[in-house]
A protein has these predicted regions:
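Surface-exposed assembly/interface segments
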Residues: 1-390
């Protein structure tokens, strides 16, 4: 110590022990919209804007473009924290696509959907539920999936321009990323600007519903089979039967396309994402992996540059184990564990200031295929006479 001799009492504070781990926030929507007549102060172009009341914000979103309709669609489902980037509507679809995809200017300013990457620095939140309602053509969808990977978020995409089941299935072949879900067709709903029923973007409703499920149930529950608010119909005919797999809905789901059904209201039907890896076939498998990665990483900033003693490694391991037990008890995981692998933590590695901690987990699978086995039997007639006399 700085002074070895001291005639008196000194207290040295020792901060050891496990730290509690807080799960990262997941119910944060991020979307890119058009709306040339929106309030320019409320929604400046190419700048991420934090909205805590989507319904009130929709009043300043104008009437043109997709901004007001998307905010209204989200507010029908929930009132999540939302990050919006407004871009100018181009004179052509190609120009609008360029505006939405965005770029980085010579001054380093990010435009279009790339501005979502600045949200955490500028606004203090990271959008994780991503969409571009009404403008998510193949070029936009491809870029949005890249954004989803960068943000560890999840993108909800429409089968843009598809008119039939077969077209939607063919369109799905354009993607392989686990960070996205493809939806076909759209909903229908009442448009207060047109004073008529019109197409209601399914992706906008998916953003709001995903946030609602995260808040009320959890990120381990998929989007499928939850009632959707604020819609009056479906934009295309989709044949669905709960007990028959040979349907339009069954064929779409089999090919990783989430569809829409009407049963006790309107619902998304399908839990699969666009992953080419069977380990992450379901939407909630991907989101579970993302949540755990960010939760575990961000919860251990405190440990960086601490003296690498055995007690530090033990505290990290016990903290992760405690978090796993908590997630299991709440139903977010089936199981999970954490340990130190001696084979990768040899003396040379440790001497270099490197520590490797392993953990595993089992996500909660959605019940996609329920088989009920029905049997006919006469065994309940054996005691017929005795039951009569009784």
């Amino acid at each position: 110590m700085a002074q070895d001799y001291h005639h008196g009492v000194r207290v040295v504070e020792v901060n050891e022990g496990t730290r509690s781990i807080t799960t990262v926030s997941t119910a944060i929507v991020g979307m890119v919209c058009t709306g040339d007549d929106a309030d320019a102060k409320m929604f400046p172009l190419n700048k991420p804007v934090l909205i805590t009341d989507v319904l009130t914000a929709s009043g300043k979103a104008g009437e043109s473009g997709t901004l007001a309709r998307s905010l209204d669609a989200i507010s029908d489902q929930a009132k999540p924290v939302t990050v919006v980037v407004r871009v100018p509507q181009g004179e052509t679809e190609e120009e609008t696509t360029t505006n939405i995809i965005g770029a980085v200017t010579a001054e380093g300013k990010k435009t279009g959907m790339k501005a979502l990457l600045s949200a955490q620095t500028q606004l203090g939140v990271k959008p994780r539920i991503l969409g571009v309602p009404g403008h998510d053509n193949k070029a936009v969808a491809t870029e949005l999936l890249s954004m989803a990977q960068s943000l560890r978020g999840f993108a909800y995409l429409s089968a843009y321009g598809c008119k039939t089941v077969q077209e939607a299935i063919t369109y799905r072949e354009n993607f392989s990323q686990r960070e996205g879900m493809l939806i076909w067709p759209d909903f229908a709903g009442w448009d207060t600007v047109l004073n008529a029923e019109a197409t209601a973007y399914a992706t906008a409703r998916a953003l709001g519903l995903r946030a609602k499920i995260d808040e009320q149930t959890g990120w381990h529950k998929s989007l499928s089979n939850v009632g959707v608010n604020g819609v009056t119909g479906i934009s295309a005919d989709v044949f669905w039967d709960l007990q028959d797999p040979a349907t339009d809905a069954g064929l779409l789901n089999q090919n990783d396309v989430t569809t829409l059904i009407r049963k006790d209201g309107f619902r998304f039907w399908g839990s699969r994402c666009l992953s080419d890896d069977p380990l992450f076939a379901f939407e909630n498998y991907t989101r579970t992996a993302q949540v755990l990665m960010d939760t575990m990483a961000e919860a251990h900033m405190w440990a960086v540059d601490k003296p690498l003693n055995p007690s530090l490694a033990r505290d990290i391991i016990e903290g992760i184990r405690a978090k796993m037990r908590s997630l299991v008890s709440q139903g977010y995981l089936i199981g999970g564990d954490c340990w130190l692998d001696e084979s990768v933590n040899d003396k040379d590695t440790l001497k270099a200031g490197k520590l490797t901690i392993d953990y595993d987990y089992t996500p909660v699978p959605p019940l996609e295929n329920l088989m009920l086995r029905q049997r006919i039997t006469d065994q309940y007639l054996v005691n017929f006479a005795s039951q009569v006399s009784a």
